Each structure stands twice: as C-alpha cells, then as structure tokens.
Amino acid sequence: MSMVYINIFLAFTLSFMGLLIYRSHLMSSLLCLEGMMLSLFVMMTVTILTNHLTLASMTPIILLVFAACEAALGLSLLVMISNTYGTDYVQNLNLLQC
C-alpha cells in the first residue's frame, strides 16, 4: 500500500473520528461528513487513474455531485434549525416533534 493511500485512509479515519467526537454542533458534524466525502472522492479518483479503469471514470464525478447535494441540504437544515431554535446544538433537537 503506497503512502498516498495511507494518507487518504488516515484523512477518512480522522474525519470519522471527528464525527464521533464533535457531534454536539451540527456544523462540525457537517464539516466532518464533508471531509469523509472528500477523502472518498480522492481515493476513488486515485484508484481509477492508477488501475486505468475507463468504465468507472464517471463514478467520482457522481460521488462529487451527491456530496454537493448533501452539503446543500445540510446547510439549509442548519439555517432552518438555527433560525427556529437559535442554536445549532444537536442534543437540543427532538426529532419526534412536528
């Protein structure tokens, strides 16, 4: 395993650990999710380029589109929650209320 793969896997692991540790604020959770998606994008791109997989060359672009949609939805939820409740604490949100 080359150093590039180790660094990308380490970035994914650190983002996942950040998601587990800093889950009190919604903004920090969204940033950790974006870090995970970015490391997955780079890992897929490097793997496809080094193995010359021409049929899977569109897969990283599709992943990037889904990551952009996830970021837009997450930020819109963050704005809605901060306008409604005044904070972005995750523990203050009760998802069973309508």
Curated annotation (Swiss-Prot):
Predominant subcellular localization, coarse grouping: mitochondrion
Chemical reaction(s) catalysed: a ubiquinone + NADH + 5 H(+)(in) = a ubiquinol + NAD(+) + 4 H(+)(out)
GO biological process terms held by the UniProt record: ATP synthesis coupled electron transport
Superkingdom assignment: Eukaryota
Gene Ontology MF annotations: NADH dehydrogenase (ubiquinone) activity
Function field: Core subunit of the mitochondrial membrane respiratory chain NADH dehydrogenase (Complex I) which catalyzes electron transfer from NADH through the respiratory chain, using ubiquinone as an electron acceptor. Part of the enzyme membrane arm which is embedded in the lipid bilayer and involved in proton translocation.
Protein name: NADH-ubiquinone oxidoreductase chain 4L
Organism per entry: Gulo gulo
Gene name, Swiss-Prot/TrEMBL: MT-ND4L
